[in-house]
């Protein structure tokens, strides 16, 4: 079966569980400029082999905007790939609070997962907090 390609582009995040299908390539792009108060949790469940996810978040924080969120990548089967890349530029008193979890079950061999968060602190009052 040929690879199924999915592209998700959003300007906000919400609590959600996204199934990354067998033989699929999913790209999730978030372009965030408006913050929120309560933490948001997004789960990505890999239940089929040869599934790939690219999660890309661009954050521009201004004023007192807050961006608290968590991603969870559950690799339940072998031969899955996940790449999480969070980039932020924080101005004024803005804050980004990112927690990234990658869970690989004992039997999913040949799984590849990567997570990175890079923030430009463009104000002495801006804050960033990352838990990989």
List the predicted regions and their residue ranges:
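Conserved beta-strand/loop scaffold segments within soluble protein domains that form the structured core
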Residues: 1-132
């Amino acid at each position: 079966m040929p690879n199924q390609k999915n592209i998700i582009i959003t300007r906000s995040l919400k609590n959600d569980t996204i199934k990354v299908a067998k033989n699929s390539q999913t790209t999730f792009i978030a372009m965030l400029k408006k913050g929120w108060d309560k933490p948001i949790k997004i789960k990505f469940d890999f239940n089929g082999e040869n599934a790939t996810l690219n999660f890309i978040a661009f954050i521009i924080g201004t004023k007192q905007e807050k961006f608290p969120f968590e991603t969870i990548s559950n690799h339940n089967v072998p031969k899955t790939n996940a790449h999480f890349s969070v980039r932020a530029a924080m101005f004024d008193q803005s804050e980004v609070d990112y927690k990234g979890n990658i869970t690989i079950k004992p039997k999913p061999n040949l799984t590849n997962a990567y997570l990175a968060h890079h923030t430009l602190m463009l104000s002495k009052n801006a804050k960033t907090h990352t838990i990989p």
